[in-house]
């Protein structure tokens, strides 16, 4: 516990808030190039093959990003847009790829929650 005179001399230091998505550098999204597309297996109670991609961002940082939705067209050297948002059962995956922008196609035959998967409105 500091004394009053110590507080007058130095003051209190503001605690810096750590960001959950540092690679975005406080931008809403970032563009990047896929360096590798692969599958990960999730943590203990779950079982699946989750689709992920290593992405080299315009900032020069390389991150692992999740590819949401069923099926995708991503390959190496594709240009993608990523946003923040972790995947709870994949350790180290803190970013999502935005579907329906740049080289990423939207999910076809998607009826509900279309805006999250870049799907066009189906013709009646």
Swiss-Prot record:
Superkingdom of origin organism: Bacteria
Keywords: Methylation, Ribonucleoprotein, Ribosomal protein, RNA-binding, rRNA-binding, tRNA-binding
Gene Ontology CC terms, in alphabetical order: ribosome; small ribosomal subunit
Stored Pfam families: Ribosom_S12_S23
InterPro entries to which the protein is assigned, alphabetical: NA-bd_OB-fold, Ribosomal_uS12, Ribosomal_uS12_bac
SUPFAM superfamilies, per database record: Nucleic acid-binding proteins (SSF50249)
GO biological process, one term: translation
Region (Disordered): 1-32
Biased composition (Basic residues): 9-20
Family assignment from sequence similarity: Belongs to the universal ribosomal protein uS12 family.
Subunit structure of this chain's protein: Part of the 30S ribosomal subunit. Contacts proteins S8 and S17. May interact with IF1 in the 30S initiation complex.
Function: With S4 and S5 plays an important role in translational accuracy. Interacts with and stabilizes bases of the 16S rRNA that are involved in tRNA selection in the A site and with the mRNA backbone. Located at the interface of the 30S and 50S subunits, it traverses the body of the 30S subunit contacting proteins on the other side and probably holding the rRNA structure together. The combined cluster of proteins S8, S12 and S17 appears to hold together the shoulder and platform of the 30S subunit.
HAMAP family documented for this protein: Ribosomal_uS12_B
NCBIfam families membership: rpsL_bact
Listed name of the protein: Small ribosomal subunit protein uS12
Species, as recorded: Leptospira interrogans serogroup Icterohaemorrhagiae serovar Lai (strain 56601)
Gene coding for it: rpsL
């Amino acid at each position: 516990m500091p004394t009053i005179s110590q507080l007058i001399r130095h003051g209190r230091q503001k605690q810096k808030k750590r960001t959950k998505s540092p690679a975005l550098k406080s931008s809403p999204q970032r563009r990047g190039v896929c360096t590798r597309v692969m599958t990960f297996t999730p943590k203990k109670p779950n079982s699946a093959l989750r689709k992920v991609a290593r992405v080299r961002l315009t900032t020069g940082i390389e991150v692992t990003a999740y590819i949401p939705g069923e099926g995708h067209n991503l390959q190496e050297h594709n240009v993608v847009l990523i946003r923040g948002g972790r995947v709870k059962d994949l350790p180290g995956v803190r970013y999502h790829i935005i579907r329906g922008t740049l080289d990423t196609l939207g999910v076809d035959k998607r009826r509900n929650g279309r805006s999250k998967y870049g799907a066009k409105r189906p013709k009646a």
